[in-house]
């Protein structure tokens, strides 16, 4: 063994590498750095919600995805280059690798996808999520002590989004003049995303109100914040979000030893929210669809007055509660008694529910069986958009899931391609409603990526779960370890991740960028931190590290020597471990620099790839504009450019065919339509457009009948499929023909 390795300074040198240092400018205090980072995170999450909304608008969503790719790459590059982050052990690497494999598999599915253009878009979305996940892990390495900033940012952004959603009720004339639904859905245009955002906000603000550290005035803001989020959640009528919030709260109160403080904040804020929600549910102007603007405005203004009163009262109560808890803290005996009372209340809830079920017709068995049948019945009707929806058990998810399993049967092992569910589902749907997602991560993944994709998802989930358990200290042997502020914060972030996970399991919130990045950021930070026992040991011994060694270990990327090396401590010719670490750290980090450059290059390539469908849409719009101006040759040229930018989509080919038809070049138009069919043969619309051209323009009823037959097979529930087939049949002299079951 060398003298360096055997030096008695080796443990100290290891601590020097592991001792965390906040990423802050010398002129900024830690509190100011936390405030700035909190504001930046809140702005990022809120901007994601308002710009990308529900993730269904291609251009706006793509811009958000590119932004996350860039931010994530820069954070990863900084973590690879800066010594204070590079010297740490790479915690959470297996989970990150599994996530990367899932993203790569999503992109590879384009090869066999039945809807390759949608698979391209979904691969870009997944790479953006991977960038957000990896970037958050890098930030946790760069600024390990700034974990409160993430919780602050989550809470603040959720309050902003929830507040905006509620304001659309308060001022419908200015913010939601054309709204027809009573349920809150702004800014996502999807009510369950509003509910999930509010649920995440409740958990993050629960930590803020229950924590022992921090400024009491800031902690008091948790009271009105939680109440506002709860009002938004309830007015969205989102049952899935309520379920997710319940799971998150049960986990938080079961794990975090701040139950009394948390219960006081949660119950107090919920009492204020319950009063407002109860009044709102009784108002026709707030709970009925398709009402005149005047009726909605009158009720909305009254709601605004009540909300303002609620916020003021809860702010005062929060300040008073914080002052009393600081001046007269509860004794250990009082906390123990209160904890038992809370436990008794929790136990009492299922008892009361069981009594109510037993008293209902059919008893417990009958009621449970009835609820289960409604929940799993594919033919169940959609519950009305009223407050009664919150207690209804029927759902159309069973229908979407059954259709997803039918799609999965087309290609069980590798799937039909990422995002192909929306296209292939038309073949199996039982109604005329168009649905893009299966409303559940598991059925959606089975349909799109098959058993292989689900296996990769479960692998990533399992590796993340194990790392999270170790980081929070949930193993039995770690329960007795101290609950410092960071451990409470990590448990709260884990609860946020659970809320998102439960919601995405029963809904399509995985595809909503703001919802996804909130949950992924919380999940990533947790596993980027060391296991609890190791972190506590390093924190306890970090003060023993000499300041000179800490400054060297966390010095700049590359600089000349600034002092003479220390004397030999292990015999003639040997050097100290600190000196060896210092000398090695001063050499330019070629390998990390290459890795950082590679990460940035991959992010740039992914961003450029994600932007191509948007560029294709722009070119297609320009082609139509040239056509309207009479510049037919230019329109054809630009339409071909659109196809070159997105060769996997049939839409540029449809535009090209339209322009060629206007030019009178029918053969070229037919060739473009046939190429669209070859590009996406599982899409009924490609066959339908080809058949319409063959029947109406080329007067080829026999060819049109064959095309319409394929369209009917792929989308039999579409009224256009039936009418087109019958029209082509009559043109072929077969007026009594019946649409076939197979092409």
Identify the role of each PLM range.
Residues 256, 451-491:
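Hydrophobic transmembrane alpha-helices and their immediate junctions
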Residues 1-108, 114-121, 131-157, 207-225, ...:
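Transmembrane signal-anchor hairpin modules in multi-pass inner-membrane enzymes, especially those
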